[in-house]
Amino acid sequence: MFNGIIVIDKAAGMTSGDVVYKLRRLLKQKKIGHAGTLDPEVTGVLPIALGQATKLIELMHERPKAYVGEGMLGLATDSYDLEGKILAERALSQPVSDQAIKAAMEKLIGEIVQQPPIYSAVRVNGKRLYEYAREGIPVERPKRTVQVFLYDLTAPSQFDPEKGRQTFTYEVECSKGTYVRSLVNDLGEELGLPAVMTKLRRTASSGYKLQDAVTLEELADNLDHAEDYIQPIDSFFADYQQVDLDAALWQQVKNGAWIKLPLDADKVALRYNKTVKAIYRAKGQGLYCPDLMLLSNE
């Protein structure tokens, strides 16, 4: 059984569940889970936990994410992307300046309150929003507070005078739970124009980047060397404070005991034989207790 994290560069047209299903067949193991759903038409970084690494999925969700994408001014849909029903169209008589677009983006940086698109996997009363939408049932979408660390243009925008549409490319860095589709819609509201997301690619998630990723096709063609594409569990904890345990402390940790450490970090990675065996969290006065046990990690 494989243990670790494989970062898949997801192709368009697949759900995150499709990727897990294909990996189970390719790698011939069941214990596999993904960290961070990507919509079918969104491409890019999808971290997949294998074996023992499935214990990390909740922690993986907590890490910031990064995207590059494209949006368009002059059109709005109910899904905030091109998959939805058109709600508004307005031909622009002249382009919006890039300065104005960037200024509107800056207003959406920081802690903001977002409403997810109606076509999203957010649950309300045990049912996903897209299920309500497909059945035509009105439902109040829950608001959530998210963090946007970066929202900026990556190139000059392009104006099509014949269609009265303006396209722009952008980059986003954000916390978990942020909908980039909503950010594009919110940008349009700031500018007083309909806006829709036309493309999106995730470039980083859970601490892993595109350069760490492999496509399913590449993996299938090189199955004899599958291990070459798998990141060790320890790679996820590279930015944690590391503590090497002696034999006595290791015995305590194996038994789930609280231990005393001369540290002030909130969480620490405890290593034995150069391998992370547990994550402990601070309880005050130098005491640390178990947060995540990885005793079988080799």
UniProtKB/Swiss-Prot annotation:
HAMAP family: TruB_bact (MF_01080). This is tRNA pseudouridine synthase B. Keywords: Isomerase, tRNA processing. The keyword Repressor does not apply. One of its GO terms (molecular function) is tRNA pseudouridine(55) synthase activity. Its EC number is 5.4.99.25. Signal peptide: none annotated. GO terms for biological process: mRNA pseudouridine synthesis; tRNA pseudouridine synthesis. It catalyses: uridine(55) in tRNA = pseudouridine(55) in tRNA. Gene3D superfamilies: Pseudouridine synthase (3.30.2350.10). The active site is at D39 (nucleophile). Responsible for synthesis of pseudouridine from uracil-55 in the psi GC loop of transfer RNAs. SUPFAM superfamilies: Pseudouridine synthase.
